[in-house]
Regions:
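Enzymes that bind and transform nitrogen-containing heteroaromatic metabolites
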Residues: 1-144
């Protein structure tokens, strides 16, 4: 990624983290136009893990002039963004579905149960599907 940014073929990343990077790593990233965004605020997930709250991440990015972002990740990222506390932050979703097993031992993409009760399911509107090789891309909006 850094080489692509140096060559002018891509933009350098902004890396959001809770840990202060080494001066050397920060300098390497800044030299190509990227930066580390260190957020010390912490939140607890429903599984009891410590994380940075999505609201803090997205507000900080918005303060830097960014109105729309792409967030890449697997089932854990998708589930955390589509959870009841974060779903209002998301307008649209683009998910690549690969022909691999889902569920136990695979990628689990569904809201976790909270104290034995079910949570509302995020339902996409205005969906579009596109096959790309063996994969399928699903696009849709959560809100009108």
């Amino acid at each position: 990624i850094l080489n692509l940014a140096r060559q002018g073929r891509g933009k350098a990343p902004w890396i959001v983290t809770a840990k202060t990077p080494s001066a050397e790593n920060a300098k390497l990233l800044e030299e190509v136009g990227g930066c580390y965004i260190v957020l010390k605020s912490q939140a607890q997930t429903s599984e009891g893990k410590t994380t940075i709250a999505w609201l803090d991440i997205l507000q900080t990015i918005k303060e830097r002039g960014i109105e729309s972002i792409m967030i890449e990740g697997g089932g854990v990222i998708i589930n955390s963004l589509l959870s009841a506390e974060n779903a209002d932050l998301i307008k649209s979703v683009i998910v690549t579905i690969a022909p691999t097993w889902l569920g136990q031992g695979g990628v689990v993409v569904s809201p976790s149960r909270s104290e034995g009760s079910t949570l509302p399911v995020a339902r996409l509107q205005r969906t579009k599907w596109q096959q790309l090789g063996d994969d399928v891309v699903l696009c849709g909006t959560l809100r009108a």
